[in-house]
Design a protein with these regions (language model features):
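Extracellular beta-sheet/turn segments enriched in Thr/Pro/Gly and aliphatic residues
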Residues: 113-134, 196-213
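Structural motif
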Residues: 135-154
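Short, acidic Ser/Thr/Gly-rich low-complexity loop/linker segments typical of extracellular
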Residues: 152-154, 162-176
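A short, solvent-exposed loop/turn motif at the edges and junctions
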Residues: 185-196
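Active-site-adjacent "subsite" loops/lids of carbohydrate-active enzymes
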Residues: 210-226, 293, 298-350, 504
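Glycine-rich, aromatic-flanked loop segments that form ligand/cofactor-binding clefts
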Residues: 242-245, 273-322, 355-359
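Aromatic-lined carbohydrate-recognition surfaces of secreted/lumenal glycan-active proteins
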Residues: 290-300, 357, 383-422, 463, ...
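Substrate-binding cleft of secreted/luminal carbohydrate-active enzymes
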Residues: 433-444, 456-463, 469, 476-540
Length: 541
């Protein structure tokens, strides 16, 4: 790598000051506006040969707020949404406002009101098979993995003592236990994980189907009791049953006291620290909530700044290259970068998450791309092995500790036969994942899809076709498709509000195409509760 020059210490100091100012600004915004942040600058358009469309926007977008607007439109594929009167009242008042009745909620951290903890409507079904105290595994452990109807689940993962094997066509397995081996974890995409305590008799592991229906909590949102309480209300009262939490956010910060040496050395301990993070995850799990750790991977301003030898380099300056948000990226070809992210994911698994989801697991799409230099030539022949190689290693290492592994991909990967110039192609990625999570926001399809030039006017069709094509291209693998859906105002076409009709159309499109659950994206964590079905024994799972 080229040296940064004599001005490097001064530049590094200025960058740290800028990061500090950015953190203070975000914290102030979170307090005053319920975590509203400004949209990123418009990226430069590029043309990708032999593809449906080039990527011209970042994969994560900013909701521009909601307003009542006109009466909701009707969309093809839109089935009856829940009546407003059938849903509980979920007031979304800003923290600074008074609660109904004029009473001000009790102050908590950063002055936010603390909502009462909301117990589940019914005790969640157990996800553990306990055993008597003092019981240990026999030397050879055998058993079967079944679904609730007693049918075998071929290919289910059985994890014991850091080793993972697959059940055979009859759902049967046999493995050797080590002295002092802890609990066994049994899992299969589309089902809840099952934790089995040591026992002497053969194991009969019955897995329950799980279609995760999630809301996203930002790096700052998860630390805010007001925001967290509103999402908890939705988890308790509506069909939501899962949550996505930033474990390494868009700037590379970690929201809890990390013990990963490389992260501490890089300064990844963020400005917000949740003291009892394990307790938070345990509380979600006690409510029957499926927990997903989001790890932003190759977009990492913290690591790139601390370790410029691992960064994408700007050929004009010899310093870390930055995108349109002035954030640096680390080099996807560097296996030390792979190890860094996997170790952070391991720590998330130890804290109790069910799944690790890698985001920005790709090459950059905006900024002066021609000035970006990598450890290897940047071409399709090199990009695909880099991204797929990272995911293969992550799935191998994290699968052996008992968590599911997922990755976020652009929605256009459903249609493009190329790698979209970012190292993402379904056929190469699917074999190394439990869940593949396309970002099928209609606003993100800036030139439409075949047959639909205006995607925001056709949310059902856009989501349905995207999920259908990805499932088709992933045939022969165990991966399940769980898309990200749009719960924010359109920013690319007519700025329409995405309300009940648009959100239900997306959900129906995913369900009808065979998606296994879905996730709602809103960077303000301000979700449209009226679009969600009320909680019921069937909707809860």
């Amino acid at each position: 790598m080229e040296a940064a020059g004599e001005g490097a210490p001064k530049a590094a100091a200025l960058r740290h000051l800028a990061d500090g100012g950015y953190a203070v600004g975000l914290l102030a915004s979170a307090v005053l506006f319920g975590y509203a942040i400004l949209p990123p600058s418009s990226p430069q358009a590029r043309t990708v040969p032999t593809t449906v469309a080039a990527v011209t926007s970042t994969d994560r977008t900013i909701g521009l707020g909601k307003s009542p607007g006109p009466a909701p439109p009707s969309y093809p594929g839109l089935r009856a949404a829940p009546r407003e009167s059938a849903l509980p009242s979920l007031a979304r008042t800003l923290p600074a406002e008074r609660a109904p009745g004029g009473a001000r909620p009790a102050p908590t951290e950063r002055g936010r009101g603390r909502p009462a903890l909301l117990p589940p409507l019914a005790p969640p079904a157990p996800r553990e098979m306990p055993a008597s105290e003092g019981v240990t595994w026999p030397e050879r452990v055998s058993g079967r993995v079944l679904d609730p109807d007693g049918l075998p689940l071929a290919g289910a993962s059985v994890v014991l003592a850091g080793r993972e094997l697959r059940a055979d066509a009859d759902g049967a397995f046999t493995l050797t236990a080590s002295p002092g081996s802890g609990p066994m974890i049994v899992k299969l995409p589309g089902y809840d994980r099952l934790v089995v305590a040591p026992r002497r008799e053969p194991v009969e592991a019955v897995l329950r189907p799980r279609a995760a229906k999630a809301a996203y909590l930002t790096y700052f949102g998860v630390a805010d009791r007001g925001i967290r309480g509103r999402v908890l209300a939705l988890l308790t009262r509506t069909e939501l049953n899962a949550v996505v939490i930033d474990v390494k956010g868009d700037r590379g910060w970690i929201p809890y006291r990390t013990e990963v040496p490389a992260a501490l050395a890089a300064g990844a301990q963020g400005p917000v620290i949740i003291r009892d993070f394990e307790g938070l995850i345990a509380d979600f799990r006690a409510r029957g909530v499926y927990t997903i750790a989001r790890v932003v991977t190759f977009k990492d301003n913290v690591l790139a700044t601390a370790r410029p030898d691992l960064a994408v380099v700007d050929t004009r300056t010899g310093k870390p290259w930055v995108d349109n948000e002035k954030l640096a990226w680390v080099d996807p070809f560097r296996e030390e970068v792979w190890a860094y992210n996997i170790e952070i994911a391991r720590e998330a698994a130890r804290k109790g998450f069910d799944e690790v989801q890698f985001d920005y697991v790709r090459f950059p799409t905006d900024g002066r791309l021609g000035s970006a230099r990598y450890a290897k030539p940047n071409s399709r022949a090199t990009r695909l092995p880099a991204v797929a190689g990272f995911l293969e290693r992550a799935r191998r290492e994290l699968g052996a500790v008992g968590v599911y592994v997922a990755a976020d991909v652009f929605g256009y990967t459903a249609f493009n036969e190329s790698d979209t110039d970012i190292g993402q192609r379904i056929e190469e990625l699917a074999p190394h994942l439990d869940y593949i999570c396309p970002m099928v926001y209609p606003s993100g399809y800036h030139v439409g899809i075949p047959g639909y030039r205006n995607p925001v006017a056709n949310p059902y069709a856009v989501v349905h076709e995207s999920v259908r094509l990805i499932r088709k291209r992933a045939e022969g693998t165990q991966v399940r498709v769980r898309p990200w859906l749009q719960d924010f105002r359109d920013y690319a076409f007519d700025r329409r509000v995405f309300g009940v009709a648009e959100i239900r159309a997306q959900i129906n499109g995913s369900d009808d195409a065979g998606g296994v659950g879905w996730m709602l994206w809103n960077p303000r964590n301000d979700y449209t509760g009226e679009a969600l079905l009320p909680k019921s024994p069937l909707a809860a799972r």
